[in-house]
Amino acid sequence: MLKCDICGKGPLAGYQYSHSHRKSIRKWKPNIKKVRAIVDGTPVRLHVCTKCLKAGKVQRAL
């Protein structure tokens, strides 16, 4: 699974409960986008979560 290159956010695991309260393991996956960003003056392709994109932690290359 992919992780955010900025904040390190990755998938989380937990339980999905049925109505009768039986458990099965499930995953919550972060919303990761492939983005061209400027790092040290050069455009680089990064995997970034949408929370970091909205917060402006990445300067996108046009």
Swiss-Prot record:
Question: Keywords for this entry?
Answer: Ribonucleoprotein, Ribosomal protein
The major lineage groups are:
Bacteria, Bacillati, Bacillota, Clostridia, Thermoanaerobacterales
| A Gene Ontology biological process term | translation
- InterPro entries, A to Z: Bacterial_rp_bL28 (IPR050096), Ribosomal_bL28 (IPR026569), Ribosomal_bL28/bL31-like_sf (IPR034704), Ribosomal_bL28_bact-type (IPR001383), Ribosomal_bL28_sf (IPR037147)
Name the family: Belongs to the bacterial ribosomal protein bL28 family.
> Can you name this protein?
Large ribosomal subunit protein bL28
Recorded source organism is Thermoanaerobacter sp. (strain X514)
- Molecular function, one GO term: structural constituent of ribosome
- One Gene Ontology cellular component annotation? ribonucleoprotein complex
Q: Which domain of life is it from?
A: Bacteria
What SUPFAM superfamilies does the database record attribute to this sequence? L28p-like
